[in-house]
Amino acid sequence: MNNAAGVRAAVCRFTILGWSFVMAEAQFDIVIRGGKVVDGTGAVPRKADVAINGDRIVAVGDVEGTGTREIDARDRVVTPGFVDIHTHLDAQLAWDPIGSSSCWHGITSVVMGNCGVTFAPVKTEDISYLAEMMESVEDIPREAILEGLPWDWRTYGEYLEFLDGLPKGINVGGMVGHVAVRWNVMGEESLKEEPATQQEIDAMCELVDEAISSGALGFSTSRTLLHRTPDGRPIPGTFADDNELYAFADVLGRHDRGVFESAPRFEKAGADWTGLKHEIRTLGEITRRSGRPSTFGLVYNAVRPDMSDVALAEVSTENSNGATLRPQTTCRPIGVVLGIQHRTPWARAGSTWKSMQNMEL
């Protein structure tokens, strides 16, 4: 980035009817003028111009050159594009290339494939099942998923090639999900609480290895009991034992790239937080084995409001012991919780919702 802002415009001289004119040629494609720049480094916000050529910022400061397009940013904040690390746009991008509503809020890059739910790897006979998983977990209609995607891939790498060929208004990356990987290898057995055999773990690791080699940003899993199949059972991977999770961590470690993302099982935290601490310690061990970071959802719990503080303290302990844990939080539109058109209120109903569930509208 060129912070020396004294880049002067070129000039063009021409004559019309004896008069001589000098017209400045634009030095930049875009100049954003006079905004308060918050650059994401922790530096103090400052008033500055930002000049852009092509897809690169080429000057920040008092830019003297002109732009083909000039944007008046006075009384506005100018920032780099935000990265939304937790989305489920895996299907939506096929019919909504700008990735709304993420793009409406300054987000220019999204990460998909969270919570273990992805559309690859997939066998032909399992296409409908993976669509049902996304509907059940993330409230995205199965019919839209089946009709909106071509489903002409089988590996995660082929799915990434499909994404690469789409016209897109945002940058896109994705993680390979435990649900698809486990179901691909184990089928119906993937839903049971019994641990996978070593042969099954090896087969799953081959699929994860293919995904990471092809450009996946990491591996995701769901351990929370809130994520259910359409018939009410916890989704594949929920009951995977530590050995299985460590095997996936080892794949990331061999590649020395990728993140391990988890929807943790905090609803079994325990009266003395034993369950919560075990969950975080397991994730900590995953990062120590792999040398790769792990991120997981951590949201406020109205029933146990001190849960977040306990979790953060345990994260601090793990990180001081060589782990690399990065909790993430989220915000949700109020309609997801209070509206009656979604699965979420009913599937996770408290006593108030249950009393309403069978009432006539």
Regions found by a protein language model. Give the residues of each.
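Histidine-rich, glycine-flanked metal-binding segment
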Residues: 23-33, 37-81
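Divalent metal-coordination and catalytic microenvironments
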Residues: 35, 55, 75, 86, ...
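Di-metal (Zn2+ and/or Mg2+/Mn2+) metal-binding site signature of metallo-dependent hydrolases
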Residues: 78-101
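Divalent-metal coordination cores built from histidine and acidic residues
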Residues: 95-218, 255
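Histidine/acidic residue-rich metal-binding segments in metalloenzymes
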Residues: 157-168, 193-361
